């Protein structure tokens, strides 16, 4: 054991993370499990492997690690895996930008394709889907290695032998297995239906991936003609006029009752459309009568379904006007007008449609400027459209009240931390407007294990899917051939075609409990850890990850996948805006970690209450600086105590701590020492209860408050007695230092491990969590009054602008119940350098003070 003369935090991360990994102290040992209650299992969030982690990841993953370390010290066998979410759009976009490539599924596979980083869109080259996926996997693996380095530096006590990816063969196998299970049970189905569509990514989007943004627009008033009158409607989307299939008004709106059942003619395109009543129409919105297009928004979908209207789509998957006029446009004038729109972007189509309306005087008045909410894909930059597409869905309770009630009940069975987050889950569940859309028209993702028979013209018969045998999983249907067919029948008449859609990333991430627990590969492991003890996650993905995981678990196991869930808050920038990579205000943690150290950053994260948003100013991170000061103080306090146990006669040489154990509690007899241990018991109890309730900030504050009081007051009071070799003081210092190191170990693992190594040859992170000492004697008020005494003495010297070393010839001081501290007056007088002291019962204050030789 080599204790430095001046303890330092530098280098501790590298020193101890290597030792932890090599000694495998955090590995989950299945053979040690004798009963489920021995295990504490964590369904760790797999971070998206696309670029860099930001400070928000450090924040929330620290919260989880604190609980993992605490439970391990509580005697649990902790299952704490790490996954990488390398499946989906973020990875695709990163690969496109990094290598300047675009995926073209029509191109053949190029073997041994090697590409370097380019980052130049103008030089983008097209590659095959298989080559594109290989690049995604290559770049993801590089990112994952960097992520693992950062997590190790942060001190996460993850079992690195329990890792998984959401796009490797195991993940594909598991996802395809449960998809086929869902198809067989009727929980998964295919439908041709209106779909929210992102024209930039050219893929369907689920309800859970939508966000509303306030957009400035205009209401345009258009004139529709019928036999007797002009009907005026207001719309923000005149470009959809060619897709109008009806006008709708509220059945009780007297302005339009006489029109119900009649028809009007659309301007420009001359289409005859009905005027119909529907209670979803809003009399106070616009002119009170609405144009129904297929489709402008979700309300259009509702009207289309409820009123059994025809479909007249005019937008393609790229967000342009379709090439051919829809069937309802039959007039020569209308078809000529549509031809001028064909192929235009929607913004160009809007401009041209308005020009045509103005030219025939079908625009009434001036446009009315508004700000209104518009739906966007959370990762997109253009408003969502609604297209009729073929998609795969999983039933989520949208149209099944019994399933909704069951999912609500499963939510209530969980312990939510904080409890208020349950309401978000329930609100989402009761506000669904569709089943869960799980198919995506992208390239990187779990392939659907499906082929379709073709008719005698080679067209896919989507109502006649071919499913594989479970023994053939995992597979890619664009490469594999269904049983009973040969490769030369692919795409041929009376042959087969592959499903080219891939599963939404949440369709795989919803199975992380099964994936991390190796449901298919190691049933014994899964049985030991499921249901998991904890799902930690962010509040923004309750509607996606948490909700979808409960659905999949209900279908697979008829139970919730965890017993509790801990929801972290957001990290805000100094302007109180949420930090995120998409907004460009997220800070990477490396610079902060390098500058202040992992323990300091962990301290900052631990100070925040669970579920509460926390601001961070990286230019002046006050709490991080406080955390660094705390970690350094732990080292200095431990060094002081260790050096007190050097050879008492010569006070030289290295300390021999082995002779200090086991601790002889009978040696503790001084009233001040016993009072401190009473307060320590209180600290242990409060900290333990706080951590059991996921209140890491309270646990840290409780222990930290005790520790600073211990250092600033108790140590100063007993220092002379300890230097003199008093067994009661020495034993108390040893006991308290050992226990405080344990109490702080989940929060600042590096400083506590370093300090512990000076006392012991084992790791503090394999020790048992402290239990209360339950000493029968000791008055907790004694230490409080003693601290008040010392505070007044220090304050008096500071006010007189004197050094704390200045001696006091005479002190008259008032304290409540001063008789309590009479037994320790010798300690107090020595600590305050006081010759004579007179105690008076009363409010705490100095009544008179005379200094000896002045020391400034």
UniProtKB/Swiss-Prot annotation:
Q: Does the keyword Protein biosynthesis apply?
A: yes
What Gene Ontology terms describe what this protein does at the molecular function level?
aminoacyl-tRNA deacylase activity; ATP binding; valine-tRNA ligase activity
Compartment(s): Cytoplasm
Residues annotated for ATP binding in this entry: 581
At which positions is motif 'HIGH' region?
Answer: 47-57
What domain of life does the UniProt record list for this protein's source? Bacteria
Q: Which Pfam family is one of those matched by this entry?
A: tRNA-synt_1
GO terms classed as biological process: valyl-tRNA aminoacylation
Q: Chief location of this protein?
A: cytoplasm
**Motif ('KMSKS' region) on chain:** 578-582
User: Which keywords, in A-to-Z order, does the entry hold?
Assistant: Aminoacyl-tRNA synthetase, ATP-binding, Cytoplasm, Ligase, Nucleotide-binding, Protein biosynthesis
Catalytic activity field: tRNA(Val) + L-valine + ATP = L-valyl-tRNA(Val) + AMP + diphosphate
Gene Ontology CC annotation, any one: cytosol
User: EC?
Assistant: 6.1.1.9
InterPro entries, alphabetized? aa-tRNA-synth_I_CS, aa-tRNA-synth_Ia, Anticodon_Ia_Val, M/V/L/I-tRNA-synth_anticd-bd, Rossmann-like_a/b/a_fold, tRNAsynth_Ia_anticodon-bd, Val/Leu/Ile-tRNA-synth_edit, Valine-tRNA_ligase_type_2
**Regarding domains, what does the record say?**
ValRS has two distinct active sites: one for aminoacylation and one for editing. The misactivated threonine is translocated from the active site to the editing site.
Q: Which family does it belong to?
A: Belongs to the class-I aminoacyl-tRNA synthetase family. ValS type 2 subfamily.
The record's HAMAP family line, in alphabetical order, gives: Val_tRNA_synth_type2 (MF_02005)
The record's function comment reads: Catalyzes the attachment of valine to tRNA(Val). As ValRS can inadvertently accommodate and process structurally similar amino acids such as threonine, to avoid such errors, it has a 'posttransfer' editing activity that hydrolyzes mischarged Thr-tRNA(Val) in a tRNA-dependent manner.
> Subunit composition?
Monomer.
Name by which UniProt lists this protein: Valine--tRNA ligase
The record lists the organism as: Tropheryma whipplei (strain TW08/27) (Whipple's bacillus)
Q: Which gene encodes it?
A: valS
């Amino acid at each position: 054991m080599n204790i430095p003369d001046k303890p330092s935090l530098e280098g501790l991360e590298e020193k101890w993370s290597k030792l932890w990994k090599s000694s495998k102290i955090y590995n989950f040992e299945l053979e040690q499990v004798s009963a489920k209650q021995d295990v504490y299992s964590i369904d760790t969030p797999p971070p998206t492997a696309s670029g860099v982690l930001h400070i928000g990841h450090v924040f929330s993953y620290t919260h989880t690690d604190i609980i993992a370390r605490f439970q391990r010290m509580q005697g649990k066998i902790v299952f704490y895996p790490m996954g990488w979410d390398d499946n989906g759009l973020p990875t695709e976009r990163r690969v496109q930008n990094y290598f300047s490539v675009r995926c073209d599924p029509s191109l053949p596979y190029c073997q041994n394709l090697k590409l370097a980083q380019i980052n130049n869109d103008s030089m983008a080259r097209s590659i095959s889907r298989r080559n594109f996926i290989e690049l995604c996997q290559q770049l993801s693996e590089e990112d994952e290695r960097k992520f693992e380095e950062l997590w190790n530096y942060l001190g996460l006590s993850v079992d690195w032998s329990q890792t998984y990816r959401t796009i490797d063969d195991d993940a594909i196998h598991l996802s395809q297995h449960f998809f086929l299970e869902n198809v067989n049970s009727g929980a998964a189905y295919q439908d041709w239906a209106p779909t929210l569509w992102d024209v930039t990514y050219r893929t369907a989007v689920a309800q859970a991936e939508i966000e509303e943004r306030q957009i400035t627009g205009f209401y345009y008033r258009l004139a529709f003609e019928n036999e007797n009158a002009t009907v005026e409607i207001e719309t923000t989307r005149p470009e959809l006029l060619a897709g109008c299939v009806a006008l709708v008004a509220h059945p009780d709106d007297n302005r339009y009752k006489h029109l119900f059942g009649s028809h009007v003619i659309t301007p420009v395109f001359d289409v005859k459309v009905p005027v119909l009543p529907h209670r979803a129409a809003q009399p106070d919105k616009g002119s009170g009568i609405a144009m129904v297009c297929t489709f402008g928004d979700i309300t259009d979908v509702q009207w289309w379904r409820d009123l059994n209207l025809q479909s007249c789509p005019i937008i393609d998957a790229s967000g342009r006007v379709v090439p051919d006029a829809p069937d309802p446009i039959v007039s020569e004038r209308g078809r000529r007008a549509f031809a001028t729109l064909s192929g235009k972007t929607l913004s160009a189509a809007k401009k041209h449609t308005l020009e045509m309306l103005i030219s025939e005087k079908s625009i009434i008045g001036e446009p009315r400027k508004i700000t209104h909410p518009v739906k966007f894909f959370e990762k997109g930059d253009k408003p969502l459209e609604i297209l009729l597409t073929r998609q795969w869905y999983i039933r989520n309770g949208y149209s099944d009240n019994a399933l909704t009630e069951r999912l609500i009940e499963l939510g209530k069975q969980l312990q939510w931390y904080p409890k208020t987050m349950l309401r978000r889950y329930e609100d989402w569940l009761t506000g669904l407007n569709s089943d869960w859309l799980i198919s995506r028209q992208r390239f990187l993702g779990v392939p659907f294990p499906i082929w379709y028979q073709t008719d005698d013209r080679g067209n896919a018969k989507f109502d006649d899917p071919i499913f594989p045998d479970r023994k053939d999983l995992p597979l890619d249907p664009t490469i594999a051939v269904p049983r009973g067919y040969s490769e030369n029948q692919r795409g041929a008449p009376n042959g087969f075609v592959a499903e080219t859609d891939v599963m939404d990333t949440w369709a795989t991430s919803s199975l992380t409990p099964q994936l991390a627990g190796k449901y298919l590969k190691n049933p014994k492991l899964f049985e030991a850890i499921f249901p998991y003890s904890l799902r930690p996650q962010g509040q923004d993905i309750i509607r996606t990850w948490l909700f979808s995981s409960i659905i999949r678990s209900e279908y697979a196991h008829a139970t919730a996948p965890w017993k509790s869930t801990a929801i972290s808050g957001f990290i805000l920038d100094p302007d109180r805006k949420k930090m995120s990579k998409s907004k460009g205000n997220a800070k990477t943690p490396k610079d902060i970690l390098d500058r202040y150290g992992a323990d300091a950053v962990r301290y900052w994260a631990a100070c925040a209450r669970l579920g509460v948003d926390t601001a961070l100013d990286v230019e002046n991170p006050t709490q991080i600086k406080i955390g660094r000061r705390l970690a350094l103080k732990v080292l200095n306090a431990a060094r002081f105590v260790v050096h007190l146990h050097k050879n008492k006669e010569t006070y030289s040489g290295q300390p021999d701590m082995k002779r200090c154990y086991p601790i002889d509690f009978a040696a503790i007899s001084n009233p001040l020492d016993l009072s401190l241990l009473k307060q320590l018991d209180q600290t242990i109890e409060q900290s333990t209860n706080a951590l059991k309730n996921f209140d890491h900030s309270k646990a840290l504050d409780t222990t930290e408050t005790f520790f600073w009081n211990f250092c600033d007051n108790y140590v100063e009071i007993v220092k002379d007695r300890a230097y003199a070799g008093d067994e009661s003081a020495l034993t108390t210092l040893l006991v308290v230092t050992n226990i405080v190191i344990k109490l702080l170990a989940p929060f600042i693992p590096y400083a506590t491990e370093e300090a512990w190594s000076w006392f012991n040859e084992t790791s503090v992170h394999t020790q048992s969590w402290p239990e209360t000492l339950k000493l029968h004697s000791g008055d907790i008020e004694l230490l409080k009054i003693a601290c008040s005494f010392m505070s007044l003495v220090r304050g008096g010297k500071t006010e007189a602008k004197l050094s704390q070393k200045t001696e006091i010839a005479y002190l008259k001081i008032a304290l409540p119940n001063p008789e309590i501290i009479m037994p320790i007056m010798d300690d107090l007088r020595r600590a305050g350098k006081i010759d004579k002291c007179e105690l008076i019962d009363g409010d705490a204050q100095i009544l008179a003070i005379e200094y000896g030789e002045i020391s400034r």
